[in-house]
C-alpha cells in the first residue's frame, strides 16, 4: 500500500505522547508509506526505522497559543515545517495531531487554497454502518455565510465522489427542521442556492438525528455546529457502549448475554472510536492535510497517515478540483460575495 507516497508528520502534539506517535509512524511505515517526521529525535526513537526520516526540531505550537500569530512567528515549529515540506515538494501530504488551529493555519498558509475556494473546510467520515457519510465543516469556520455553506457542499460532494467512491453523492444541509424555511438566515439562504445549483444532488435539510442514519452522503454545517455535533456523537457512542458493558456485568445472566454480544459490541466500539478514522481532512487546499484527533493512540496516528496517503494515491486534490470546476463551484454566484 502507498508505495512511493511520502507524508510529513508533525512529531509533537499527540496527547498520548511521543511513544504513541512513534509507534504509529512505525505502523504506517510498515505499510510502505515513507515518513518525514518533524520532532525531537531522542524522544521519538525512530532512528534506523526503514522508511522513516526524522528531521530534528524542538519548537512546537501548543493548544493554548493563538494559532495564526504563532504560525507566523514560529517558522521552525514542527507543524509549520511539515507544511513547508509539502510546499517544497519533499512530501506529498502532511499530518498533525497537535493544535487544530495551528495545523489549519500552517496548512492554509503553506499549501494554499484551490483556485476560487474561499475557505477550506474540515471534513470527517462518520462511522455510519454500510455506507460512507462525509460531514463538514467540523471546526475550521465557526462563522460562515450562505455562500460558504454552498461551497462546502461542492467540496464535500467532490471529495465523496473522488475518494470515497460515492457516485453522485446526495448532499444535505444540517438544520433544525426539514422545511426549507427552517434554520438561521445563512442556512435558509444556502438552501435556496443549493436547490438551484447545477451539478449537485441536493437532499434538502437534514436534522441532527439524521446524521447517524445516513440520510445524505454528505452533510454540511458551519464549523461551530459541526464540531459540537461531532463531539456529541463521539461522547454518546462512548457512553452507550460503556453503559451496555456495565449492564452486562451487573448480574450473571446479563454477563452470559454480554459474552454473546461481545464480538458485535467490540466491532461497534472500534468503528466508533476516533482511532479508526484517525483524523479530518482539510478540504479546499492544493495538497492534502490531515488534522489528527488529539486523543488518538498509535493506531489513530497510523490511520491518519494512511488516510493522507490514500488521498494522494487516488489523486484527491486534482479530482476534487476538476469536479469543482465541472460543477461551477469556484465560479460565478458561488464565489460572489463570499468574503474572506
Q: Which residues does each PLM region occupy?
A:
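Glycine-rich phosphate/nucleotide-binding loop
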Residues: 108-135, 215-219, 223-334, 340
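Short, glycine-rich nucleotide/cofactor-binding loops
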Residues: 7-18, 71, 140-150, 291-298
Amino acid at each position: 500500500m502507498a508505495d512511493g507516497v511520502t507524508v510529513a508528520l508533525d512529531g509533537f502534539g499527540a496527547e498520548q505522547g511521543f511513544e504513541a506517535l512513534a509507534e504509529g509512524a512505525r505502523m504506517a511505515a510498515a505499510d510502505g508509506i515513507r515518513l518525514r517526521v518533524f520532532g525531537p529525535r531522542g524522544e521519538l526513537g525512530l532512528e534506523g526505522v526503514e522508511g522513516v526520516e526524522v528531521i530534528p526540531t524542538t519548537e512546537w505550537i501548543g493548544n493554548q497559543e493563538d494559532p495564526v500569530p504563532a504560525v507566523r512567528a514560529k517558522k521552525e515549529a514542527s507543524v509549520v515545517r511539515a507544511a513547508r515540506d509539502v510546499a517544497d515538494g519533499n512530501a506529498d501530504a502532511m499530518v498533525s495531531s497537535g493544535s487544530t488551529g495551528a495545523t489549519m493555519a500552517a496548512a492554509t498558509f503553506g499549501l494554499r487554497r484551490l483556485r476560487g475556494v474561499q475557505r477550506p473546510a474540515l471534513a470527517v467520515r462518520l462511522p455510519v454502518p454500510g455506507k460512507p457519510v462525509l460531514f463538514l465543516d467540523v471546526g475550521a469556520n465557526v462563522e460562515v455565510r450562505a455562500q460558504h455553506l454552498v461551497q462546502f457542499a461542492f467540496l464535500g460532494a467532490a471529495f465523496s465522489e473522488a475518494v470515497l467512491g460515492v457516485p453522485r453523492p446526495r448532499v444535505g444541509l444540517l438544520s433544525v427542521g426539514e422545511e426549507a424555511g427552517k434554520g438561521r438566515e445563512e442556512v435558509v439562504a444556502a438552501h435556496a442556492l443549493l436547490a438551484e445549483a447545477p451539478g449537485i444532488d441536493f437532499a434538502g435539510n437534514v436534522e441532527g438525528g439524521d446524521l447517524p442514519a445516513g440520510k445524505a452522503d454528505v452533510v454540511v454545517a458551519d464549523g461551530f455546529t459541526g464540531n459540537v455535533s461531532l463531539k456529541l456523537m463521539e461522547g454518546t457512542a462512548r457512553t452507550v457502549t460503556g453503559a451496555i458493558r456495565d449492564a452486562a456485568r451487573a448480574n450473571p445472566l446479563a454477563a452470559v448475554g454480554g459474552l454473546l454480544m461481545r464480538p458485535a459490541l467490540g466491532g461497534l466500539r472500534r468503528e466508533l472510536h476516533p482511532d479508526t478514522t484517525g483524523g479530518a481532512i482539510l478540504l479546499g487546499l492544493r495538497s492534502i492535510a490531515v488534522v489528527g484527533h488529539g486523543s488518538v493512540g498509535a493506531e489513530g496516528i497510523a490511520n491518519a497517515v494512511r488516510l493522507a496517503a490514500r488521498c494522494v494515491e487516488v489523486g484527491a486534490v486534482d479530482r476534487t478540483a476538476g469536479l469543482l470546476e465541472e460543477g461551477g463551484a469556484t465560479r460565478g454566484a458561488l464565489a460572489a460575495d463570499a468574503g474572506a
